[in-house]
């Protein structure tokens, strides 16, 4: 049970569920919303009651251990899975229609303003058009942020789409861009791999876990410009078989249910 719904507190007390921990963002002192307090309480209570738990990345597990949450509890590593995304991607033709796909959101950790500062700092003759995905519920707010950077004509904010159209956006991009201060997992990297696309992303732990020859990391504006040019100049290296997260997920599922 994800600790995000109305039955989570009941399940925590009954002890009949496995708690899935995506990230620990709700435990940050800055989060004072009712939903954050509810999620925090459910996680802390489940930990106190020695519930089994599932973590979705090694980064999340390191944080859990560092704050001594779920101490002496049985934990399972179930990486985020993208079976449906992968199924659709396999049916898509992989094209390059000459745009960057920024997969983001409006949460503080996404640092959308910081991403747009980097984008606007690219020389105009080198700057590909940008499509922003993940802000469907806050398009007007995002447009106001864009206005501050004077690159409105080069940016399209994508509204809510069904998964088929989302996958199509990935498959038709030049590369995927994920800019964030912190993540529990970093699904954009895995989705880029499933779409056979290179990805440019901030050098944070959750993204570094998934580093390979198609992942380009940066820490500051200078790094960003270097890696931006590198990702444009390079060719995608077809090194992926089955997504490693899927292999781990299947083995852990068998372990959880005691199958040989």
In which residue ranges do the predicted regions lie?
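Carbohydrate transferase catalytic cores enriched for Leloir-type hexosyltransferases
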Residues: 1-260
């Amino acid at each position: 049970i994800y600790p995000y719904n109305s039955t989570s507190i009941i399940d925590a007390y009954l002890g009949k569920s496995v708690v899935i921990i995506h990230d620990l963002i709700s435990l940050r002192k800055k989060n004072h919303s009712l939903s954050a307090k509810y999620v925090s309480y459910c996680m802390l209570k489940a930990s106190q009651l020695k519930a089994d738990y599932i973590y979705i990345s090694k980064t999340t597990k390191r944080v859990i251990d560092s704050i001594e949450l779920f101490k002496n509890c049985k934990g399972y590593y179930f990486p985020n899975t993208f079976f449906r995304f992968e199924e659709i991607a396999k049916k898509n033709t992989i094209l390059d229609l000459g745009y960057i796909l920024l997969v983001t959101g409006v949460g503080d950790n996404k640092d959308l303003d910081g991403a747009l500062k980097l984008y606007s700092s690219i020389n105009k003759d080198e700057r590909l058009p940008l499509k922003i995905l993940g802000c469907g519920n806050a398009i007007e707010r995002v447009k106001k942020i864009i206005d501050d950077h004077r690159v409105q004509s080069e940016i399209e904010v994508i509204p809510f789409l069904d998964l088929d159209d989302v996958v199509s956006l990935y498959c038709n991009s030049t590369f995927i861009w994920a800019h964030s201060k912190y993540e529990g997992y970093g699904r954009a990297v895995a989705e880029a791999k499933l779409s056979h696309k290179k990805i440019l992303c901030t050098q944070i732990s959750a993204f570094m876990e998934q580093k390979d020859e198609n992942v380009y990391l940066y820490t500051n504006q200078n790094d960003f410009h270097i890696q931006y040019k590198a990702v444009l100049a390079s060719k995608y290296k077809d090194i992926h078989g089955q997504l490693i997260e899927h292999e781990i997920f299947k083995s852990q599922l068998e372990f959880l249910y005691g199958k040989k």
